């Protein structure tokens, strides 16, 4: 019985309060002087976010989308090519407003 009391006294004198923050880490405020954090244990999360930049050579949606939104490309500039002249298929006739009208077989 006496041993339990001693252990409890040592524990309560060292730690004032224990709490859990929003990230699930256990926090404790102790009477001991604060130690400097070990450099190996410091999180590098902020450093990785700072270094995340768009690659200059990478194709993006904004690089190839034109202001009229007539064609949209997703990093494939050579695949989507705007043609200057319109090709007329056998089943279609070109109208004056540069759109295709289907011929109906009535």
Curated annotation (Swiss-Prot):
The lineage of its organism: Viruses, Varidnaviria, Bamfordvirae, Nucleocytoviricota, Megaviricetes. Residues 50-61 have a biased composition (Basic and acidic residues). Residues 28-68 are annotated as: Disordered. It comes from Acanthamoeba polyphaga mimivirus (APMV). This is Uncharacterized protein R860. It comes from the Viruses.
């Amino acid at each position: 019985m006496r041993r339990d009391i001693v252990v409890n006294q040592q524990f309560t004198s060292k730690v004032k309060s224990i709490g859990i923050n929003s990230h699930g880490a256990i926090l404790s405020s102790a009477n001991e002087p604060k130690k400097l954090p070990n450099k190996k244990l410091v999180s590098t999360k902020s450093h990785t976010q700072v270094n995340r930049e768009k690659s200059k050579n990478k194709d993006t949606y904004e690089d190839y989308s034109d202001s009229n939104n007539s064609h949209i490309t997703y990093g494939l500039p050579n695949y989507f090519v705007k043609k200057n002249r319109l090709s007329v298929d056998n089943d279609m006739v070109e109208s004056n407003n540069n759109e295709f009208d289907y011929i109906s077989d009535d």
